[in-house]
Amino acid sequence: MGKYSIDPENPIKSCKARGSYLRVHFKNTRETAQAIKKMHIRKAYRYLKDVIAKKQIIPFRRFCGGVGRKAQAKAFKHTQGRWPVKSAEFLLGLLKNAESNADVKGLDVDSLVIDHIQVNRAPYMRRRTYRAHGRINPYMSSPCHIEMIVSEKEQVVPRAEEEVEVKKVSKKKLAREKLKARE
């Protein structure tokens, strides 16, 4: 079992899932992960499936050099975005894993929230491409490690409304108010 960058706040009410050396672009996966951070697990499923179907977009905020402007990104108060299908599929698989881990642990699957998600760079994978005049150039890929912690959301109980206390008014002040009311 690998080491996670943080420990969950409440280990009893949360579970973990991770993928190492995944052959999917680091930059795309990082942006996709940021889009589903702090999201309810069912909402994240829907969102990622919509991304695969190109109904919703992933806003590219950090790694946005050369990324085209899209109208769908306006929903996120941003201009640039893409539909990274492979990253969405990998994250869907990881969400399924986290959900089944929660089910085995006995947590309520419908109230799970993505508490922590982090994407780290993995070592580059090296291939080669053949160029003119007998030269060989590198053909690198940038894989990544993904870790996520999902937690059962506590039910928010509305606070009972406190009764407004009536201010105590002294006899002297009450007499003054009565006197002013007569005038």
Swiss-Prot record:
One cellular-component annotation, GO: cytosolic large ribosomal subunit
Pfam family, one: Ribosomal_L22
InterPro entries (alphabetical): Ribosomal_uL22, Ribosomal_uL22_CS, Ribosomal_uL22_euk/arc, Ribosomal_uL22_sf
Domain of life of the source: Eukaryota
GO molecular function terms attached to this record: structural constituent of ribosome
One GO BP annotation of this record: cytoplasmic translation
Keywords, comma-separated and alphabetical: Ribonucleoprotein, Ribosomal protein
NCBIfam families hit by this protein: PRK04223.1 (NF003260), uL22_arch_euk (TIGR01038)
Family: Belongs to the universal ribosomal protein uL22 family.
Protein name: Large ribosomal subunit protein uL22
Species assigned in the record: Podocoryna carnea (Hydrozoan)
The organism's taxonomic lineage, starting at the top: Eukaryota, Metazoa, Cnidaria, Hydrozoa, Hydroidolina
